[in-house]
């Protein structure tokens, strides 16, 4: 099968991988951060509350759960803080938990301070109150928690001790151990200097001290710094029983596979896009079939590096584009009109790399939709 691109013809080479439900649990905890499907017929201004297609949004979560993944709900991949406001995020969490039924325990939801504009934060007490408001709301629904980084905390904190103070007070209210999230500035520039410094070793030590002081309330930490060395260094320093969840969408296969000193679990946005292949790879890893694991994962890395390439915060556009190509939604419209945040050559390369990674589940449909994308660009 061929498609004509502006730079020439491209012949598809990938054999679509059939998605199969795992027959046994993975030997790693694996969360997929899931995207939200916009309602293209909703009368929503891009600067206001988003219009969500709840049916398709929930169906995609079922797709991910069926492939063996937990769901990281209402996180960055869902455009949290970049189009998805807190009231809509809470409704998403409620509906997702209800829809999952007996599998609701596999859903961990983002708790942050995004309803408090950073410019309106005056003290760390303001930040603690904001965290508590969201924490209590999610726990009231019976939800487990991922404690997200706070733009407001960056604004008001004067020292690493302020971070330790805030996290200790918030974690004290957690009903179950939470997953912490250290999101790097490449994902959100407003988080530059998190933990009170731009020096990584110092920031890491502050985070480790906070975790050690509150480890009864901490299941693990996800770090999204796109640096394998930093993740491994911190992983080896974590207190016993506290998990490292890789958030590294550039280096995840090796970090998950691990070494003689340990391995990372996973909480990744790229799993939204590569779920069928990643699920098969986790099954192979669980069986000790390392050659198969590497053969499946390796072709997904160039795709992930492209999708998450700078400016990284716009990676959601590539994630949703693939969901559209694969027929999980009928349109390529995003909340906050984020479908416009990448250029045509990016989409062409995403198409090619997805094909090469066996991720176009219906090549004929994918080609048809890629042609539609080309047409609206005048190609």
Go through each PLM region and give its residues.
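Short amphipathic alpha-helical segments, especially helix-boundary/capping motifs
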Residues: 33-38, 67-73, 141-145, 206-210, ...
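Short, surface-exposed, polar/charged, turn-prone segments marking secondary-structure boundaries
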Residues: 58-59, 99-102, 135, 173-176, ...
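Structured C-terminal cap/extension of enzyme domains
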Residues: 255-379
